[in-house]
Curated annotation (Swiss-Prot):
One of its GO terms (cellular component) is inner acrosomal membrane. InterPro entries: TMEM225. Residues 1-8, 93-99, 161-230 are cytoplasmic. Probably inhibits protein phosphatase 1 (PP1) in sperm via binding to catalytic subunit PPP1CC. The chain crosses the membrane at residues 9-29, 72-92, 100-120, 140-160. It comes from Mus musculus. This is Transmembrane protein 225. Residues 30-71, 121-139 are extracellular. GO terms for molecular function: protein phosphatase 1 binding; protein phosphatase inhibitor activity. It is found in: Cytoplasmic vesicle, Secretory vesicle, Acrosome membrane. PANTHER family: TRANSMEMBRANE PROTEIN 225 (PTHR36477:SF1). Keywords: Cytoplasmic vesicle, Membrane, Transmembrane, Transmembrane helix. Interacts (via RVxF motif) with PPP1CC. Expressed in testis, epididymis and spermatozoa (at protein level). Not expressed in brain, heart, lung, liver, spleen, kidney and skeletal muscle.
Amino acid sequence: MMHIPNRSIQAANIFFSSGAILLLIVGLIMEDWVELIPKVRKDKTTHSPWLGCCPPFWPEESLEVVRRIMRMTLNISIYLNLIIGLQFSYMISQNKCVHLLVGFLSFFAGCLLFYAIIVYHHKLNKGQYVYFVNYKTKWIAFTVYLTIALFLTCGIFCFIQSTNRCECMKFCIPHTESKSQEMIPSTIEVVSLPPRCAMPRSIVHVHSVTSKDGSLNRPHTQARRVTWAL
């Protein structure tokens, strides 16, 4: 089974959280989320849930909840990106609790943003029959769903990292290191020592002295001559 290294997961989380912040900032700058057509005048008016004021024909208090949730989501995403960056640079610990915290914040931010966009569409449908005739959704409104997907993906990766942290550290070994470890046993060779040379046989010549009466006289000290047979 193949496991993703921790550094790759953290790099992907930084990319996803940074992309979510970028999309939220783009949605904050762009003001034409929807195009409203009022009943009295036929002039088209653009609107965004980030705006601090609503059109004169649409009461402001009806969208205050949506605006607060969107701001809360932006703040959470900034803190989330900061925590992931500190974790990637080893400035905070990389234990299981930190991974679970980052995953919870990612899911919480995604759920908050999803709730905000659902409430905003509900307010649009409700105001269509009271304050304006029709509305048309622009392309910038669909970036919210991409932001939600980025938050959820970041949370899933954090939970995977918290559950498979030990397995990743155990099995995800670099290719060069594993190859060198496999080659170590094969390089060991048993070198046998040459057989111990046997000592050459020696031929000992004992010189005896013959006495005058013909008997062999073996003195106490005998003279010996050693000849090595090679």
